[in-house]
Regions:
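Membrane interfacial helix-start motif at the N-side
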Residues: 25-67
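Transmembrane helix recognition focused on a "late"/terminal membrane span
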Residues: 2-37, 70-164
Length: 164
């Protein structure tokens, strides 16, 4: 499969015109990511695949982590709705499959999402970009604990509403 950055003319021009800024913003592994962005094919990002929210937090992609957390919370909410409405076991496997699909999408498109995040932040003039070890905690909060809290709160509310 071809590289999404090379297939989009605006992204390609941005990459060519802002190489130095991108290298400064990436901080650690700058050359590695720049080669991936310039490469002819997309590469799977295994950190994004298996540890998506933590990787996003480390790379300071907090907005993207929040979006992923909302998707996970939505899937948890759908699982609860299935549990209340349906008696079948299919609901758990469907929701689990959707979670795995989300993980797969994060792994496959992780580098492109990272490029788009860098592009957005460079265009906005953000100076503090790079990596952050404390960002791993933010990623855990936004991508793991927030969806669990939202899903749990909705579950409690649904149970209270459905009690006779």
């Amino acid at each position: 499969m071809s590289n999404y950055i090379k297939s989009n003319q605006k992204d390609k021009e941005f990459l060519e015109n802002n190489e130095e800024d991108i290298l400064k913003c990436i901080d650690k592994k700058g050359e590695y990511y720049l080669n991936i962005f310039k490469g002819s094919k997309n590469k799977t990002n295994f950190c994004a695949l298996f540890l998506g929210p933590l990787w996003m937090g480390y790379r300071q992609m907090y907005f993207e982590t929040f979006i992923v957390g909302c998707c996970v919370a939505l899937l948890g909410f759908l699982a609860m709705i299935y549990e209340f409405v349906s008696v079948t076991v299919i609901s758990n496997s469907v929701i689990r499959s959707l979670n795995y699909a989300l993980m797969g999408l994060m792994g496959f498109f992780g580098n492109y999402i990272y490029f788009l995040s860098l592009k957005r932040r460079i265009n906005n003039g953000d100076k503090k970009i790079g990596v952050s070890k404390i960002g791993i905690l933010y990623g855990f909060l936004l991508g793991v604990l927030m969806p669990m809290a939202i899903t749990g709160a909705v579950g409690v509310i649904l149970m209270l509403l459905l009690i006779d």
